[in-house]
Amino acid sequence: IGAGVGRDGTIAATKGKAKTLAELIXMYDS
């Protein structure tokens, strides 16, 4: 998930997905 982020023009889409997943994981992990 972290690899490649910020290198291609897909950073926006990747960051958006990563953020969503991170939030969901954080909620379940809490």
UniProtKB/Swiss-Prot annotation:
Disulfide bonds: none annotated. Binds 4 heme groups per subunit. GO terms for molecular function: metal ion binding. GO terms for cellular component: periplasmic space. It is found in: Periplasm. Its main location: periplasm. Participates in sulfate respiration coupled with phosphorylation by transferring electrons from the enzyme dehydrogenase to ferredoxin. Monomer. This is Cytochrome c3, 50 kDa.
